[in-house]
Amino acid sequence: MDIIVGARATGHAVPGCNVYTLDQAAGVLAAAEAARSPLILQVHPGGVGAALWPLIAGLRVLADAASVPVALHLDHCADIVTLRRAIASGVDGVMVDGSTLDTGANARLVALVATDAHAAGVAVEAELGRLSGSEDGWTVAAREAQLTQPGEVAEFLSASGADMLAVSIGNVHGATPVPPRLDLSRLASIGRLTDVPLVLHGGSGLDDAQLDAAIARGICKVNVNTELRAAYSAGLAGHDAAPELVDVLSRARSAVGSATSQVIERFGSAGLADPGGPSREMADAR
């Protein structure tokens, strides 16, 4: 995925923004265009249900019409039928989620999909290690077992054919009572072992210092879901007693746009889409 390659070359991270509706996506893209930032629109199959295929079709249109480089990515999917249909539907990337499997089975699942994906010019993201929605109740040993083991990275990537690697370094999905603490030394070790772009899931709860340190150690894509979903939902809810629908939607788009602008600023991707900016390659990505 050219957007990710460009981010790695310039030492920045691109936001991977999960969206649930075309209207929410429009607000996200408006912020990206205003900031001249490349962006990845992501769809989680479990989050949108039967709307997945029409949503992908609509997002493809929005992505292609954007004035900045925008990629379309299927997030967290372990179903081969769904993954193959997404590849045929015109996505730019798929995340083959074999994180519940042992390392060997995970690599075999990713490799099975990668054959079709690469033939279609689609990038493949894999996850080594496993993230949780919360760290509550984990023993130290259990938490350690979930983390990406640096010694497994090279063999896993060789066997799987993955183009991007999502790492588990203490990051968690969703909101947590206590901000997660990243194992930055583990991340640095992983980064020294591979040139494959690294991905960080669960980016919403991280403080700026940890985020900056992760990007400096090779993270090129950071997934953001919770804060964008919350902003859009708050925009929908914060209306008058008898609102006009168009006004409600406009407010929600503005709210998610503001949240996206903050994400772009934090990740350092503003201006990367323009010729003469930090990455000429990214301006030519699409």
Residue ranges and their predicted role:
Residues 201-204, 224-225:
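Glycine-rich beta-strand-to-loop/alpha-helix junction loops that act as flexible
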